[in-house]
Structures are given as C-alpha cells and as structure tokens.
Amino acid sequence: MPLSFGDLVTGWHSTGIPNIAMFVHISGDAFPEGDLSKLPDGPTQAQREAHRARAVVEVTGVDGAVARSVIETVNGYSYTPLAAVEAARRVLEGERLSGFATPANVFGDGFAERIEGTLITDF
C-alpha cells in the first residue's frame, strides 16, 4: 500500500535522491479512521518486545545499479523515544546544525544503529 510519510521528505533532504516511494505492509485495521481519541492505549511493553520493526530500502542508481539494505530494530513505540533521547544527548554535547536538518544530516549515517537492538544489513 503506498503511503505518504515524513520519511519521504526527510529521505530527499538527507540524500538528494529524487523519486522516493514508500510502501507499507498493512493488515487488519492498522490505520483506523474517525475519532482517534477513542483508540485504545498503545501496545504493552511485552507486546512491543514481541514485535520488532523491520524496513527494507532499495535504491536504483542512474546507471541501473541496485543497492538494498534492511534495518531491524525495536518496536516503533520503543524506538521513537530512545532515538529522541539519543538526539537530545548529542545536541547537548554540541553536535548540532542551525536550521532545518534531518537526523542523518546532523548525526551521520550511523545514527539509527546507536539505538540498542538495531541492526542494518546491506545486501
């Protein structure tokens, strides 16, 4: 299913790669509609630990060469606050840029892997 996420914007700002598309596997009522305040609380810690997040990226160069990588990490509900704390820690230590920047722009390619339990595999 094609979706429009912030990753599409930040991906271009971080890499300069045009024509980025994002597809997500969705099952059941993963994207409910209506009054979102009526949604149940997020997953429990046990549920988050049982369901890790995975994403695949494929890039095709102008010469037709294809590069693929997979990131596997903790559940998104866990990853987001861990990454925010890591980013804040690094900013407080002086690692920052003025104006708009993505995490990859500011902290470099290895930022995602600084989050414990995260592994990126290149194919």
What are these regions (language model features)?
Residues 1-123:
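C-terminal catalytic/substrate-binding lobe primarily of soluble NAD(P)-dependent oxidoreductases
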